[in-house]
C-alpha cells in the first residue's frame, strides 16, 4: 500500500503549487475583465483593455520590454553556448570553477540591481576608478549605463544573472553528447571542432532554444530590474502593471491585470512559435529518417537482384 501511495505523495507538492498557480492565473484574467466583487465590480467588460490599448505609452513600453528581454535572452544564450563549447572542448565541465560560475543564479534580482548601481552608476566604483586614473575628467563623463532609456543596465543585469543559468542548463547535455558521439566522430577522422559544430551543437539545439525561451519569458514578465535600473520613460510593461496595482484607487486594479494579460499573450505567442519550430524540426527529422530507410531498402533489393542475376 505504501509503495502505491509513494508516487502520489511525491507529486503532492507539485500538484499543490500547480493548483495555486492556475487559481491565481484565473483570478488575474477574471479581474482583467473588470470582475472584482469585493470592489463592487461585477459586470465583465473589455473597457480596461480598450483603455490600455489607447494609452500613448503602451507601444513604447511593449517595444522596450521586447527589446530588453530579447537582447538579454539572445546575448545570454550566445554567451552561454560559447562558454559551454570552450569548457566541453577543454574537458573542464565540472569542479570548483563551474560552481563559482553558477553562483549568480542564486543571487536575487534586487541584490543584482544594487550591485550594478554601486558598480556602474556615475558615482559608482567603475567611474571612480576611471577618474582616479585620469581617463575621464569627472565622474559625470562615465557612460550612462544605469537609468538610461535604452535599458543597458537592465540588459547587463539579466546577462549577469541568466548567462550562468544558460551554462548550467546546457553544459551537462553538451558534455554527454560530445563524450559519446563527438569523440566517436573524432576517432573516425573528424577534427574536434568540426565534430562539435556538426554533431554536438545540432543535437543540443532543442535544449538551447528551450533555455532561450525560458530567459525571454522570464525577462519579459519580471519587474525588479526594470523597476530599479530603468529610466522614468519608457517603462517596461511589468513596471506599468506594478504601478497600476499600487494605485490608491483599488478600482484601478483591472488595469494592472489587463497589462499582465498582455504580457501573458506575448509569452503564449512565444511558446507557440517555439512549439511550431520544434514540430517542424521533428517532421523534417522524421521525413529524412523515412527517406534513409527507403533508400536503404532499395539498395538492399538492388543488391539482391544483382545477386540473383549473377546466379542465373
Question: What is each stretch, according to the model?
Answer:
Residues 1-2, 27, 71-102, 114-118, ...:
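Transmembrane-helix boundary motif in ABC transporter permease subunits
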Residues 21-56, 230-232, 285:
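Short membrane-interfacial helix/loop motifs at transmembrane-helix boundaries
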Residues 46, 113-159, 193, 229-233:
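Membrane-interfacial helix termini and adjacent extracytoplasmic/periplasmic loops
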Residues 34, 171-182, 254-302, 307-311:
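C-terminal transmembrane helix and the adjacent membrane-cytosol boundary/short C-terminal tail
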Residues 2-4, 49-57, 227-276:
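Interhelical loop and adjacent transmembrane-helix boundary motif
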Residues 24-34, 166-169, 207-240:
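Non-cytoplasmic
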